[in-house]
Regions:
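ABC ATPase nucleotide-binding domains
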Residues: 1-85
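Structural detector for hydrophobic anchor residues on beta-strands
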Residues: 38, 56, 92-93, 152
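Short low-complexity stretches enriched in small and charged residues
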Residues: 49-53, 61-64, 88-91, 125-126, ...
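Short acidic/glycine-rich beta-turn/loop cap or linker motifs at sensory/regulatory domain boundaries
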Residues: 62, 96-101
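Short, electropositive, low-hydrophobicity segments enriched in small/polar residues
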Residues: 67, 73, 92, 167-168
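Residues located in well-ordered beta-strands
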Residues: 70, 82, 94-96, 153-157
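Non-catalytic connector elements of ABC transporters
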Residues: 90, 99-190
């Protein structure tokens, strides 16, 4: 920064710092970026770090750009399964699509409920009986002991208390990988 560069290139600048110092330095780098208005290319394999520091992110796989966008765009509207799972955790399951107007019907597992997903959430044209891959973020799911037509039976096999939230790993069906759920402590208090 002493030489007033046009572009600042940073290759894993926080890689060897402990977690607390990394969080502090993320904020400091962001502050410097804003104060100097300098274009910065920040290479990191830490998705949380990228989302905290970057205005626009590029997700690469084997040297190919998969998606460019804001952290919100990449997290909430990923272009494909790779980006979805790279930017945060995503639970996936395969299903056969059915249609009902402007929604796609997807059955979860053998005993599971039918999800109704808006066609605007699909990344490609989906027709009835197409094989589809459906993804759901851990924070959009919850654990309950009550059975209903909207629940998926499963067995909790790992519980991790991680400060502000609890992460559950749940086996739901032999055909589906264990499902991850994250429930914040505030919602458990209610």
């Amino acid at each position: 920064l002493v030489y007033d560069p046009d572009i600042l290139l940073l290759d894993e600048p926080l890689a060897n710092l402990d977690a607390k110092l990394r969080r502090y330095m993320r904020a400091e780098i962001r502050r410097i970026q804003k104060a100097t208005n300098i274009t910065t290319i920040f290479v990191t394999h830490d998705q949380e770090e990228a989302m905290a520091v970057g205005d626009r992110l590029a997700v690469l796989r084997k040297g190919i750009v998969e998606q460019i966008g804001t952290s919100d765009e990449l997290y909430n509207v990923p272009k494909n399964a790779f980006v979805a799972n790279f930017i945060g955790k995503m639970n996936f399951f395969s299903s056969k699509a059915g249609k009902s107007g402007d929604v796609i019907e997807c059955k979860v597992a053998n005993d599971g409920p039918v999800l109704f997903i808006g066609k605007d959430r699909a990344h490609t044209e989906v027709n009835a009986h197409d094989d589809v891959l459906v993804g759901g973020r851990p924070e959009h799911l919850f654990v309950t002991k009550e059975k209903s037509e909207k629940t998926i039976p499963g067995k909790v096999h790992i519980i991790q208390h991680l400060g502000s939230f609890i992460r559950y790993e749940v086996d739901v069906d032999k055909a589906i990988s264990p499902v991850t759920l994250e429930i914040d402590m505030d919602s458990l208090q209610k």
